[in-house]
Amino acid sequence: SALLVGYISLLRQRKFMGYSLTISFQSGTFQVFITASPIVLISVMGVSPQLYGLYVMFIPAGFIIASFVSGRLVTRIPVNMIILAGNIFGIAGALMQVFLATSGLATPLLIVASIFISNFGTGLVFANCYALALSTVPPSFAGAASALGGFFHQGWAFVLSFFVASLIHTSSLPLGIMQTVTTICAVSIFVFAVLWSGRHTRKV
């Protein structure tokens, strides 16, 4: 009963929900790629499994580099601005996917480059959002908050994986569209649930 009350309380906290859902939707770009890339790169573009493994090996580099950069910037720039920059990188990488697919310029290397950009954005968002999400709740709710955030993250990953596997058969366009949708959701939630809410609260 107490646990249920705690979860209900967390669901009512706008900033906690804003940060948690921002993480979930932003990291969806990587989940979309992991689900779709074997179909797009191996089945559609004819990349060998060995070369595919090499391509995928470089994908986490974007996240790793962004985490390092974020650690350097966090004492100089407001954390929310770093998160917003991560959202913008995510959208840029997703739109690059759409452009490559619609222009006929898509190659395995360029597709991997676009997800590198998106993953760089996720690296700027991930740790900062988690830290701020937990900072908005009482210490006694930290465990429940972490579990609820993980539920949103994995739940959205499940939904994306289902739709991506159903849509992608002959083109990388659905990959770009799904990435664009999830990144636009991420930045919209962050702006309205976190940034706008914070300004409104200060005015009140």
Regions found by a protein language model. Give the residues of each.
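A late C-terminal transmembrane helix in Major Facilitator Superfamily
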Residues: 129-172, 178-179
